Design a protein with these regions (language model features):
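Bacterial N-terminal signal peptides that target proteins for export
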Residues: 1-8
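Repetitive helical segments and hydrophobic/amphipathic motifs
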Residues: 11-12
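N-terminal signal peptide c-region/cleavage motif recognized by signal peptidases
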Residues: 17-18
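Boundary at the C-terminal end of the N-terminal hydrophobic targeting segment
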Residues: 21-23
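Short acidic capping loops at alpha-helix termini that bridge into adjacent secondary structure
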Residues: 65, 151-152
Length: 152
């Protein structure tokens, strides 16, 4: 009976100790536009945990063991942008986009949408509203991004 209680006590102590904390990502930013005011904040640390912003602190915080530091001290950081009118499966198309309806299949459109989602993300847009596709490829892409199978 004593062994399970000791094991439980040790496990509880470890789970509540600083050694069990999840490592954070610290972004040291020279300037930050938060969108909550018209002014820029200077020399701040953005604390990210589980891919979500946990805090924005004044000054450059020191990293704890296991933390990742991204040095953007010479950069301006801002929230991700939203594009409320995209066509991920036919973005950047010209007149040939209409002719491709006869030669491309569902998989072609899905791969194209994945490529455009990555380009859109790299351009600073973290949220988009897709306004239609022919084969539900953007629904499949959304699901793949959510599961970590694709970048977007």
């Amino acid at each position: 009976m004593k062994k399970p209680l000791i094991t439980l006590a040790v496990a509880s102590a470890l789970l509540s100790s600083p050694f069990s904390t999840v490592a954070d990502t610290l972004i040291h930013a020279g300037k930050v536009f938060t969108g909550t005011s018209n002014s820029l904040q200077e020399n701040v640390t953005i604390v990210v945990e589980d891919n979500k912003i946990k805090a924005v602190k004044k000054g450059f915080a020191e990293a704890q063991e296991g933390d990742t530091v991204i040095d953007l001290k010479t950069s301006t950081v801002m929230p991700g942008l939203m594009d409320m009118h995209v066509h991920l499966s036919s973005q950047h198309g010209g007149p040939q986009t209409y002719l491709e309806r006869f030669s491309l299949n569902e998989a072609d459109y899905a791969l194209r949408a994945a490529n455009y989602a990555k380009i859109t993300l790299d351009s600073g847009f973290t949220t988009v509203r897709n306004l239609g596709d022919g084969y539900n490829e953007t629904v499949a892409l959304r699901n793949a991004i959510s599961k970590g199978y694709a970048t977007g």
